[in-house]
Swiss-Prot record:
Keywords: Amino-acid biosynthesis, Branched-chain amino acid biosynthesis, Magnesium, Metal-binding, NADP, Oxidoreductase
Gene giving rise to this polypeptide: ilvC
Keyword Zinc annotated: no
Pfam families in the record: KARI_C, KARI_N
Residues that hold substrate according to the record: 253
Organism: Deinococcus radiodurans (strain ATCC 13939 / DSM 20539 / JCM 16871 / CCUG 27074 / LMG 4051 / NBRC 15346 / NCIMB 9279 / VKM B-1422 / R1)
Pathway assigned to this chain's UniProt record: Amino-acid biosynthesis; L-isoleucine biosynthesis; L-isoleucine from 2-oxobutanoate: step 2/4; Amino-acid biosynthesis; L-valine biosynthesis; L-valine from pyruvate: step 2/4
Name this protein carries in UniProt: Ketol-acid reductoisomerase (NADP(+))
UniProt cross-references to HAMAP family, sorted A to Z: IlvC
The UniProt record lists the keyword NADP: yes
Catalytic activity: (2R)-2,3-dihydroxy-3-methylbutanoate + NADP(+) = (2S)-2-acetolactate + NADPH + H(+); (2R,3R)-2,3-dihydroxy-3-methylpentanoate + NADP(+) = (S)-2-ethyl-2-hydroxy-3-oxobutanoate + NADPH + H(+)
Amino acid sequence: MSAKMYYDRDVDTQVLENKLIAIIGYGSQAHAHAQNLRDSGFNVVVGLREGSSSKAKAEQAGLRVASIEDATKEADVVMLLIPDEQQPAVYEKSIAPHLTAGKALAFGHGFNVHFGRIKPPADVDVFLVAPKGPGHMLRRVYTDGAGMPGIFAVQQDASGKARDIALAYARGIGCTKAGVLETTFKEETETDLFGEQSVLCGGVTHLIQAGFETLVEAGYQPEIAYFETLHEVKLIVDLIYEKGFEGMRHSISNTAEFGDYVTGPRIITDQTKAEMKNVLGDIQSGKFAESFIKDAESGFPYMNEQRSKMRDHTVEKVGKELRDQMPFINKKELEV
């Protein structure tokens, strides 16, 4: 049975009328949520820590800014959109003391609730709304009059209206224009982490890096290797995004399609899939969450080491030089 998609026509936004929504943070997702909700006619306040460099940006966008504590006190719905590793401490210090009965606590990702790092009181609603794309794109498609697909979930329904509130929120940021699916905190967290690690981030970047290194080590020009293993990825992914695998294969040459069939299984083997299952197991057991939290609490020594190593890789240096010569690439839209 196909999963049900919810659209604008399925949502009654009256549940959020005359309510105040606090967006905690003003990063990639938060700036888009705040501006989209405001432009949809909802009352919004942005909660930021004292001295936050984001205050000027939020105010420049025409948004009211308050401390996290004051925003939580005032608001009926509190959406926590700061980095996962920062949420528990901010929640305990600045949100929990002011999260009174009848309010709703919302998330863009289920990580901290699912892994027990944030435990909301029983007398508040708890839900998540997660657009399936980066914040700058969420904002762009909204201003273009379109929407971005998303998912929503209810963890706790103290008011009996948590689901309606979640859907109204999803409509406010533009997701129900494209359609939203209902899920659970468990499913959203585990599938999101798996997708990021095995395919979207870990899988893609390491596949590109291995391909680039193979060509360069064989004596080919790094610039040519960059075009063949990294630059053209977007062209293929865009075809898959718009038309699926079949549509993509219809759009490429017979040579490329034949190579796809005979070589793909040599790169992504049964062993690769078996390792993907191990990765999923580490996510489900909480092992990945533990390692992430441990690194975060130590100041991210492992992650900073990896960032430094990747920054010095030839593919990054060559890529920067080539991208600087491509005026059609919009670099500013990635800035928050």
